[in-house]
Amino acid sequence: MPKIRTQVNCRVHTEVARQGILFNKDKGQHILKNPLIIQSIVEKAAIRSTDVVLEIGPGTAELQKRVQGTIYQSKLQIVIGDILKSDLPFFDLCVANIPYQISSPLVFKLLTHRPLFRYAVLMFQREFAERLVAKPGDKLYCRLSINTQLLARVDMLMKVGKNNFRPPPKVESNVVRIEPRNPPPLINYQEWDGLIRIAFNRKNKTLSAAFKQTTVVTMLEKNYKIHSSLNNKIVPDDFDIKQLINYVLEKANAENKRARTMDIDDFISLLHAFNAEGMHFT
């Protein structure tokens, strides 16, 4: 058995050396090698002749090769840098097999970019992709699910097995289409995310239990007093933030609800109920 492993490793290293490329798996450098998968991704992207297309983590340029020898070759621009630290240019579409380690921050960097792009066709680790599209009641439904779906429509396009990459990752992959909601929802995202963080910190517990945590109570009381001061509202000496929290939850009929079963409309209604009583999450 050791001999077989040595022979396999030898063949892999020989191929890598022949191409002059060394891949670092710790940095998510798994190169998509199946031309049929690559072509399918390009087709599903439905790129128009006038589109500006952003690709992230081009690897061995398998996607860019599609413009070689065409009238679009002269328009190709390569930018070297950290995508999470760089200002994004204008673009219509984003088509990419991204490093999986940056999946979550990259999704929200794209969705908060202005002006809005039309949509993105991206490759993710399968479990991450399934979290993106998960619905209330699903096992994988989480803060990532609801925050992404607040800002975008998300659709699963295709599954991609790990053997389609070089070197093969330990996980399976999916291609996902993310289309920003245009116009964006009329909501303060920082306020929204503050509420969602509390609710999904323990998504299986009731909201009543989630809002009894000391850190949550302290934060809401501090924010209440700050906003009251900014609006010249006097806070009584006997003010009890816990009573106000319970009042809002009961009024919204949400005290016994659990985050894992609540949808976007449920949380928007709850956020408005808190804000109406002068309670804020930022």
Residue ranges with predicted function:
Residues 15, 41, 210, 247-248:
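Residues within well-ordered alpha helices
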Residues 173-174, 178-180, 184-245, 251-266, ...:
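An accessory alpha-helical subdomain
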Residues 1-198, 269-282:
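Catalytic cores of RNA-modifying enzymes
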